[in-house]
Amino acid sequence: MLRIFKFLKDLLLFIPLTFIFLPFSRLFIFLTYFNKLLKWIYTSRKDFLYCDYFSPIRKYEKRFMLYDFVLGHFKLEDLQINYLEFGVGTGTSFKWWSEHNRNQNSQFYGFDTFEGLPEDWGGFYSKGDMSSDIPKLDDDRTLFIKGLFQDTLTKFLHENSKILSSNTTKLIHMDADLYSATAFTLSQLYPFLKKGDIILFDEFNVALHEFKAYLEFTENFYIKLKPIAAVNNFYQTAFMVE
């Protein structure tokens, strides 16, 4: 049986009959990961402590309900944390977390190109969309790192390895939108993750981007992320490292 399989595979490499499916490749990939997302939702939704599924209409302000739940559940108001946000944009979420955490020893790091998306996203947004100025916050605990994550994160992690390897809880906010940026960032952060760290995804249910990156990260690194809270039909989703 194995010989037959190998023969057929090699034959298809020589006679590329599968090219007839090439125009539908993107659709097949989307359906594959969308079904993976559906399966994940139906098997994991019961594990969430807070979840609004199913909501017929998404509401932007629901993300703050998610933040508020995470803040209260983990008692983060006065806890020292290291907050890392990937995809700052105008800084709305970044500002929310810096304002709601009162510990003066906390540190807040925001990563973004501030020049918009580095590539097209989701069929609706083009390269360069969502550009913004670097936010100006009156808080000396905050620092913004401008540039592609692929260019800035490795150096940052090397220079701050002691801080990130400490027992201080890390709150990681993934708002990069793109698969490429999310997958890269999670892989680089893996050595620094410890039990109790929190990871938020801002576009989790986008099947070919943040969800795909999450799925590959948990499978490839054998890491367990405990579901905590979700709003807007899992568009914004929070996990804790187990």
PLM features: what roles do these ranges have?
Residues 54-66:
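Conserved SAM-binding loop and adjacent beta-strand
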Residues 1-57:
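Membrane-proximal basic amphipathic "stem/tether" segments
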Residues 40, 47-53, 69, 76-242:
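S-adenosylmethionine/decaboxylated-SAM
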Residues 4-11, 15-19, 71, 75, ...:
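HDAC/HDAC-like amidohydrolase catalytic core signature
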